[in-house]
Amino acid sequence: MTRYRSRANGRLVAALALGTAALTTLSACGAAPEEDTSSAATATSAADLGGLKELVAAAEKEGTLNAIALPPDWANYGEVIKAFEARYKVKVSVENPDASSSDEISAVKSRKGQKRAPDVLDLGIAFARSGAAEKLFAPYKVEAWDSIPDSQKEKDGLWFNDYGGYVSIGCDAARIKTCPETFADLLKPEYKGKVALNGNPTKAGSAFGGVYAASLANKGSFGDIQPGIDFFGKLKKSGNFIPVESTPATVEKGETPISIDWDYLNAGYADQFKGKGVDWKVAVPSDGVYAQYYSQAINKEAPHPAAARLWMEFLYSAEGQNLWLKGYARPVLLPSMTTEGTADKSFVTKLPAVEGTPTFPTSEELDKANADLAENWDKAVS
């Protein structure tokens, strides 16, 4: 079973009305592509190439899209890729599916000018912002640009949010008599040796979100993540928190029967484990409601610039957004699609229930939280 990647740090309408917001270095050999892609490489919209039809033709001429860090079981990316390949004559090559956002940025830098450089990126919001500041991305506005809330995109199209989710608590009811539903519940002695995060919060976005949510549940704030760090320190001292990165494999084996992760990943577990002896339940803790989006960006020096832009158009079409929705992720266009009647209601009704309305940290608050985690996390849980 494929592991859910621990996406590095970066982001929903009661069914979602939100719109306000907030490897190691890879190396490879290979020459830059020979074909003339200058027109596509400078296109800031499909209109710059004459329209979507012309963009499709240019992308199919390239024939390849280089992607990185897209596990098939993360937000339904496996089906997204299959649908894209079925619609267009473009083969999607995904390298290192379990890579983090930092690995993606490293690949952009280390493979500059090479055929194997990533064309497109799916990043934690902090990395999207820093990558834009480093001038690594190409500006591009998809046809659905105006439907993306201003707070969910960089004004020139250097990055734009794609899908998001809430921090949730997943629990194997086949192994746990009473599943926890709040962060406060996790401190109960009955959960000794059973609570895990999906990764290290200093590197992984889902784990980072878990600590942020725990902070909000313990009188912290976006400007003060320390209560969340202290919470996990207390959880570790009690023996409840275990230093094991939760994955589908560890869940199935019973090694991590309680996992703090994005709701779309935990909800995906529930589907995957049906008939396998795992009764996976998902709860979004009411005492620590925290939501986060990931972001799309195009490598400024993408070896397949037309395919990269066509990929973005597909992701932000109703088909692409509904495929993410099918994977329990909340697409950024869901509010407008709900209004237009293009959101698949059968998928919307399956989203985990949420109480309260989430808010989002500022860039400065995210930077401070990351710095505080880097300085204090290891000390708290060692």
Residue ranges and their predicted role:
Residues 51-64, 70-91:
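Short, polar/charged alpha-helical segment
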Residues 128-130, 252, 258-278:
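A ligand-binding cleft/hinge motif common to bilobed small-molecule-binding domains
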